[in-house]
Swiss-Prot record:
<dbReference type="InterPro" id="IPR008179">
    <property type="entry name" value="HisE"/>
</dbReference>
<keyword id="KW-0028">Amino-acid biosynthesis</keyword>
<dbReference type="GO" id="GO:0005737">
    <property type="term" value="C:cytoplasm"/>
</dbReference>
<comment type="pathway">
    <text>Amino-acid biosynthesis; L-histidine biosynthesis; L-histidine from 5-phospho-alpha-D-ribose 1-diphosphate: step 2/9.</text>
</comment>
<dbReference type="GO" id="GO:0004635">
    <property type="term" value="F:phosphoribosyl-AMP cyclohydrolase activity"/>
</dbReference>
<dbReference type="Pfam" id="PF01502">
    <property type="entry name" value="PRA-CH"/>
</dbReference>
<dbReference type="Pfam" id="PF01503">
    <property type="entry name" value="PRA-PH"/>
</dbReference>
<comment type="similarity">
    <text>In the C-terminal section; belongs to the PRA-PH family.</text>
</comment>
<dbReference type="InterPro" id="IPR023019">
    <property type="entry name" value="His_synth_HisIE"/>
</dbReference>
<dbReference type="GO" id="GO:0005524">
    <property type="term" value="F:ATP binding"/>
</dbReference>
<dbReference type="InterPro" id="IPR002496">
    <property type="entry name" value="PRib_AMP_CycHydrolase_dom"/>
</dbReference>
<keyword id="KW-0547">Nucleotide-binding</keyword>
<dbReference type="InterPro" id="IPR038019">
    <property type="entry name" value="PRib_AMP_CycHydrolase_sf"/>
</dbReference>
<dbReference type="GO" id="GO:0004636">
    <property type="term" value="F:phosphoribosyl-ATP diphosphatase activity"/>
</dbReference>
<feature type="region of interest" description="Phosphoribosyl-ATP pyrophosphohydrolase">
    <location>
        <begin position="115"/>
        <end position="206"/>
    </location>
</feature>
<dbReference type="InterPro" id="IPR021130">
    <property type="entry name" value="PRib-ATP_PPHydrolase-like"/>
</dbReference>
<keyword id="KW-0511">Multifunctional enzyme</keyword>
Amino acid sequence: MLKKINFIDINWNKVDNMLPVVIQHNLSGKVLMHGYMNQEALKRTQNEGIVTFYSRTKQRLWTKGETSKNFLYVTDIRLDCDQDALLIFVRPVGKTCHLNHVSCFQVPSENLFFLHDLDCMLKFKKHYGLENSYTFNLHKNGVNRIAQKVAEEAIETAISAVSKNKVELINESSDLVYHLLVLLHSYDLDLYDVIKNLKMRSNKQV
């Protein structure tokens, strides 16, 4: 259940009843867009679980995706320490920017964002890849073949490490990560299932 922000905790007077809001992808952490909410917009956002802004251009409430259907489903809402801005984590449908970009902020993809994008792309190719797609055909050949490739790449990674060949170590490690992601997808798992497990382990004493 979505944890709601208490309206009395917000310093509405400080922001002239127009609260700045940053929208962030709940998995990748990528900043998607920025907007404003009045009290009515925040109330609807919390009640419906879909981001609704107050559009200063349209002079009305505006639900992101009301035309494109690229809605932003809320997973968490956080109020900043000065009680005058919101950070909303979302599960986006499609691309957020009206110019057909993932984010309204066009910045170079950070390394961790790339891993998220790669994970999503490989997951997509499992179901919708072309016949000449290596990823699609791996899934077509079944989990045993994928597992075999993971084992092969793991051995080759170990050999390159023992031989102290850094270039090959990077290349083989890349192959290993790729095939491991494909293997996870074959069981309807993904990168974030592994991250969740690693976070849980990190909280335990070693």
